[in-house]
Amino acid sequence: KNNIHYAELLEEAGCQILYGFVDYKVHSKICTVTKKHKGTIKQYTQIGTGNYNEKTARLYVDYCYLTSNQEIGDDATEFFKNLALANLQGHYNKFLVAPTSLRSGIMNLIDKEIAKAKNNQPAEILMKMNSFTDRRIIDKIAKASKAGVTVKMIIRGICCIIPGLKDKTDNIEIHGIVGRYLEHSRVYAFGVDEDRVLYISSADMMTRNTAKRVEIACPIEDKAIKARILE
């Protein structure tokens, strides 16, 4: 009722409302603002791991990334265009988007770390999420562990992989954080040092997120911001 009520209020105010996709919940958290400044068009994009909710914002730990990066802005524009067209098959240069490219993108990044480990190169995977239940990604993480990849995970809720099993998950370390605020951010990092690739996302590695929702994982390429997230 609340959603319908506010949608009607916004439409009455002249806003165009996009109602999303049939059978898929839009769970991504993204906002893009375009403005004309001194004769040029500037675009600002905000991508977060948490909801636009003033109550949970006081209780949850999340990340909010605000950028004028044009490639991110182009992907944001493409995302909203596809949302308006109810098109799930969009092409993105930076984003990994569920239900089409998020799971496969994460699995490809895991495969790259497996290849490094097999070539006796440093290989590491860091994941922080609320819950971990996607069977295909679980199997891939177990494969990474067996290959010698160091896997470190911070998981707040459901976790369907057992760390420390001999010859299976020896290289997986899992922790939970209990503090004043609820840990809600999702972070996925692959590699070490300067070669590390890092994404923030609205999605947990759960089948409902990777296959049944519209989600975004956005790369963080600024060195200072990456370092701050990894602290």
Regions found by a protein language model. Give the residues of each.
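Acidic/polar active-site rim loop that often engages polyanionic ligands
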Residues: 58-61
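PLD/PLD-like phosphodiesterase catalytic module centered on the HKD motif
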Residues: 1-43, 48-51, 56, 71-73, ...
